Amino acid sequence: DVGYTVKGVLTLLHGYTNSGDDWMQMTAAPRYAADNGLVLVMPDCGNSFYQNMMHGGAYKTFVTEELPMLLGRMFKLPARREQNFIAGLSMGGYGALFLGLSRPDLYAGCASFSGAVDLSMMLADPAAPGVREVFGPVFGDGLLLPKSSDLRVLAQRVAALPAAQQPKVLLTNGLQDVEPYFILQQNDAMHKFLKPLGLAGYRRLQWNGVHEWNFWDRSLVYAIDYFLNNGYAAKKLNDW
């Protein structure tokens, strides 16, 4: 019993080397959820980029199939697409768009906060420091991004669906979020690709900020507002 009427489920995905607990410790996510009748699901998925890893766990299957089935049985959580949303930060930002666009039948909205949304940019130089260590277990020794994991390919497929079947898509990034992950550049490139597609519900927000929790806390408020279309962000402005 969460103490309020449950209106929906919001799955929050963590960043690289982080865990689901960070959302509880570093943001006001529980308060935002209570304000809006949302149940939070915050899985731990290692450094998987939310893939069915080449050398590791099947995390896409875990988040989109196994975990919802388990939680539905245990807690009778809402299963309707219209009541399910997914968001994440950094690696989890990519993950939220990857899962949301891969399974538009499951999620009514997906949001990336400071997301590593252009993995082709990150994989461009396999000899760069850390690339093989980070992505080898995920995509294999060839370090090739499969079409099934490419957000551009997935977005094109979603854009071809009827508007009512497309999830809302939100990108947020800080204007100073540059090195070492080039998040601004990745989001600029993805925005340039997504905007002309004519997705039924696409939005990008950016403001002064870097790769840190204050930015992601604020992004979470904007995402809830966008998903539920209830003016929640305007109500929180006085708190910022």
State the predicted function of each range:
Residues 1-240:
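Non-catalytic cap/lid and distal C-terminal segments of serine-dependent acyl enzymes
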